[in-house]
């Protein structure tokens, strides 16, 4: 390590360099010369140079909390050249202290950046261990919205390897019974669940890579899951989930095969890398057993899901599901009940987890019950391996539920990955194509409609994720021949009307992106008049959707009696999609998507900028109203939409198309909502700081009665805030950063 240099003057040594880099070089991630009093980089740029000394080190507890929030990822070292990735040397049993049951004593390893020692010392309390069956050679470099404080080593190797010593592995265990069944069909209630066809690459027995330890622990898990309830020797009581990956243990030379090249295994490994939810649960007693949950509370979770989420994604047969759920006598031990298919168990737990988040947003659960969503997701993920192996329409349903739950992770990468898997599986199953006459004769009307609804649910989910991230969709509207959903009985007409509205809005968002923001839109050699004609045509379509839906709602409201109006107001507390405010908010947000700077129109004319500024203020007014009424879900979809509005407001301020003084309330409201996301959403907190600085500047101007003595200085402050905001977005790979540098 480089040390300080000393110059000898008059028999005395004087230090000429510092031990550690200056603050500016650290922030810019540049190599610092460490010269005294000013380093070469700062001297060259005329910047102030200060040496804060060694960065403060975090304690083990602080590191553990940071890893749970996703702020800290241990950096791995490169393997030595020529070293075999699968070493034949045995792992010494004395490398880690063992508890009475053979589990490794919890705590951080002193070699936490060393790959070999990491694999020897897997801890049940470490949230980033090999859970969900994560393979040791899986990449860790998953983009995160809250990784703004993480410094990634450019030379770090994302791969690590297990020692091939068979004695260090858990003895092989069989796959779940549902996986080993022959190719027959098991039915339960309204569900037909075909047993999976396992690829020839998949061995009959799967070798387990354990979560708790990789020494001689012979405990068997259920259905590929392993929950540690042991409390000896100070081990943690928090159960952690481990879904076993495939590995072939029949190789005579002691080496193990890689992940089989089949769709389910590849998708499982991908999910284990990107999705971090449902891995632990805090809903446990001191002895490690799960706490009891009131049955009525679980029923409320299910009801909340069908009142809110089901209207957007109608892939579940509501009547059949509720009838089957009514036969469950013990929800808490459902994961051990062999009388129900694994896919049904997964759906029950995940639907309750999603319903819990809905009631949590509406303020209808106590603070102690808020952690139940993670506990229920934990129970659902115990069946994830069996679900992903099916590779059928049931897999699509379960992945959609998992995708909806992933919205509440403080990152968009997991939902983006899930949406890609869903859409490719959907296309592979041919769900985007209308059934032929021959197939329709062999299917009931209920089965055909269920198939169509699964596709449109997948379509809405994938379009929602893509448009929120500002990315291209995986399927074009011209490749879809499936008819729209239709009501099979009277009671679901209202729900299906909302579903059709969501489909039209998703289609509209996709059309705007394709014709205005896509790369192909920017390559067209069009005149200004032709570009304006495209935007005007899309504006007309959007206005028609809004007008038609507004008229439908007015007509329906006029036909309601007093009892129906009271019931409707109660439903609106849970499902906000029926409110006029939500419809106006979505209308304004799509107008922003249409008029903001784009590939088609990089520099909008002044009249378009004025229209854009008006829709920005309208969209924010409606967003803040929903927020105050507890109708705004605090998930990453809301965050990205908020950032898009913030981005547009900032652009309009720099272009002086929004009055600076009149926008001070909206700017402060931006700060309030961004900060309400909480400490887990560090990315949102940093963006809030930028807008707080803008709000302070506007406040100073308003106190001076609108007089700006130095307009150039104000412009520089706005441009500086814009650059700072763009830098935060760039650091986190956030694609809402669509504005070019303003010069």
UniProtKB/Swiss-Prot annotation:
SUPFAM superfamilies listed in its UniProt record: Zn2/Cys6 DNA-binding domain
Chief location bin: nucleus
Keywords (A to Z) from UniProt: DNA-binding, Metal-binding, Nucleus, Transcription, Transcription regulation, Zinc
Comp. bias intervals (Low complexity): 213-238
GO biological process: cellular response to oxidative stress; positive regulation of transcription by RNA polymerase II; regulation of transcription by RNA polymerase II; transcription elongation by RNA polymerase II
Disordered: annotated segments: 81-100, 155-249
SMART domains: Fungal_trans (SM00906), GAL4 (SM00066)
GO cellular component: nucleus
Compartment list: Nucleus
Keyword match Nucleus: yes
Composition bias type Polar residues, residue spans: 85-99, 155-198, 239-249
Top-level taxon of the source organism: Eukaryota
Additional record remark: Present with 279 molecules/cell in log phase SD medium.
Purpose: Binds to SIN3.
Protein name listed in UniProt: Protein STB5
């Amino acid at each position: 390590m480089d040390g300080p240099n000393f110059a000898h003057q008059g028999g005395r040594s004087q230090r000429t360099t510092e031990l550690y880099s200056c603050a500016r070089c650290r922030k810019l991630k540049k190599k610092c010369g460490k010269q005294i009093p000013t380093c070469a980089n700062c001297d060259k740029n005329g910047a102030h140079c200060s040496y804060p000394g060694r960065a403060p080190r975090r304690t083990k507890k602080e590191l553990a909390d940071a890893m749970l929030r996703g702020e800290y990822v241990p950096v791995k070292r490169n393997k030595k050249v020529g070293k075999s990735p699968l070493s034949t040397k045995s792992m010494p049993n004395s490398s880690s202290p063992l508890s009475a049951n053979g589990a490794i004593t919890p705590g951080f390893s002193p070699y936490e950046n060393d790959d070999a020692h990491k694999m020897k010392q897997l801890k049940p309390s470490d949230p980033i261990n090999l859970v969900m069956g994560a393979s040791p050679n899986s990449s860790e470099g998953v983009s995160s919205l809250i990784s703004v404080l993480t410094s990634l080593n450019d030379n770090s190797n994302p791969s690590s390897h297990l020692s091939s010593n068979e004695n260090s592995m858990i003895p092989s265990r069989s796959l779940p019974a549902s996986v080993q069944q022959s190719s027959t069909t098991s039915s339960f209630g309204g569900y037909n669940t075909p047993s999976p066809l396992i690829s020839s690459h998949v061995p009959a027995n799967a070798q387990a890579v354990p979560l708790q330890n990789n020494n001689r622990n012979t405990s068997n898990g259920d259905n590929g899951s392993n929950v540690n309830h042991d409390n000896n020797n100070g081990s943690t009581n928090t159960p952690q989930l481990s879904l076993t990956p495939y590995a072939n243990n029949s190789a005579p030379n002691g080496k193990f095969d890689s992940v089989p090249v089949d769709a389910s295994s590849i998708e499982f490994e991908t999910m284990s890398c990107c999705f971090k939810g449902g891995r632990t649960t805090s809903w446990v007693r001191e002895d490690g057993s799960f706490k009891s949950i009131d049955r009525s509370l679980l029923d409320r979770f299910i009801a909340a899901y069908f009142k809110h989420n089901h209207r957007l994604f109608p892939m579940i047969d509501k009547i059949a599901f509720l009838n089957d759920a009514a036969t469950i006598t013990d929800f808490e031990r459902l994961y051990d009940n062999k009388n129900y298919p694994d896919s049904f168990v997964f759906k029950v737990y995940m639907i309750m987890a999603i319903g819990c988040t809905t009631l949590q947003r509406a303020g209808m659960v106590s603070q102690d019950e808020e952690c139940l969503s993670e506990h229920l997701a934990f129970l659902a993920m115990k069946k994830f391996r069996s679900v992903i192996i099916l590779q059928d329409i049931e897999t699509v349903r379960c992945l959609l539920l998992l995708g909806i739950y992933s919205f509440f992770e403080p990152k968009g990468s997991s939902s983006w990955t899930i949406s890609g898997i869903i859409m490719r599986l959907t296309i592979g199953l041919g769900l985007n194509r209308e059934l032929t006459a021959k197939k329709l004769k062999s299917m009931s009307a209920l089965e055909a409609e269920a198939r169509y609804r699964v596709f449109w649910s997948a379509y809405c989910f994938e379009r929602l994720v893509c448009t929120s991230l500002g990315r291209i969709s995986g399927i074009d509207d011209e490749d879809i021949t499936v008819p729209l959903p239709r009501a099979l009985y009277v009671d679901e007409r209202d729900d299906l009307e909302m579903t059709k509205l969501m489909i039209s809005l998703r289609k509209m968002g996709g059309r705007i992106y394709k014709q205005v923001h896509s790369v192909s839109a920017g390559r067209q050699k069009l005149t200004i008049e032709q570009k304006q004609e495209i935007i005007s045509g899309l504006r007309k379509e959007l206005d028609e959707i809004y007008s038609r839906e507004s008229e439908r709602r007015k007509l329906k409201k006029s036909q309601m009696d007093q009892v129906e109006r009271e019931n409707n107001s109660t439903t609106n507390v849970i499902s906000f999609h029926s409110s006029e405010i939500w419809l106006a908010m979505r209308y304004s947000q799509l107008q922003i998507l249409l008029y903001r700077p784009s590939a088609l129109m990089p520099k909008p004319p002044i009249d378009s900028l004025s229209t854009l500024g008006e829709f920005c203020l309208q969209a924010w007014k409606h967003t803040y109203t929903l927020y105050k009424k507890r109708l705004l879900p605090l998930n990453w979809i809301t965050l990205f939409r908020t950032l898009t509005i913030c981005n547009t407001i900032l652009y309009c301020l720099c272009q002086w198309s929004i009055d600076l003084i009149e926008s001070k309330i909206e700017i402060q409201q931006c700060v309030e909502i961004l900060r309400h996301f909480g400490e887990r959403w560090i990315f949102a907190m940093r963006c809030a700081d930028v807008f707080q600085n803008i709000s302070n500047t506007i406040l100073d101007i308003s106190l001076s009665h609108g007089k700006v003595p130095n307009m150039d200085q104000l412009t520089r402050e706005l441009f500086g805030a814009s650059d700072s905001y763009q830098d935060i977005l760039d650091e986190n790979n956030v694609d809402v950063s669509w504005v070019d540098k303003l010069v």
